[in-house]
Amino acid sequence: MPYSRDITKFITATEPEVGLPLLALQRSKSIIGVILLVISLLFIFIGIIILSVSSYTTTGSIFVVLSLILGGGGFFLIYKDNS
């Protein structure tokens, strides 16, 4: 949606009680995306350590799969916010 930023600015200017939360939500998407990416990197490291050190292969695999899901969600939020 190329016009989403313009609509948000228009709503903020005309109705601040509606527009300001929309503007805050728009900015928080990239912050949430970065947090998801950091958590996914942490899960990757935990999963690799679990897979390499102990015999808990199922737990390590779950951490790696969770990291891929969270990382994909983080990339999606950052991409949608910057487009």
Swiss-Prot record:
The keyword Transmembrane applies. The chain crosses the membrane at residues 31-51, 59-79. Induction: Expressed in the late phase of the viral replicative cycle. GO terms for cellular component: membrane; virion membrane. It is found in: Virion membrane. Coiled coil: none annotated. Keywords: Late protein, Membrane, Transmembrane, Transmembrane helix, Virion. Belongs to the asfivirus EP84R family. This is Transmembrane protein EP84R. It comes from African swine fever virus (isolate Tick/Malawi/Lil 20-1/1983) (ASFV).
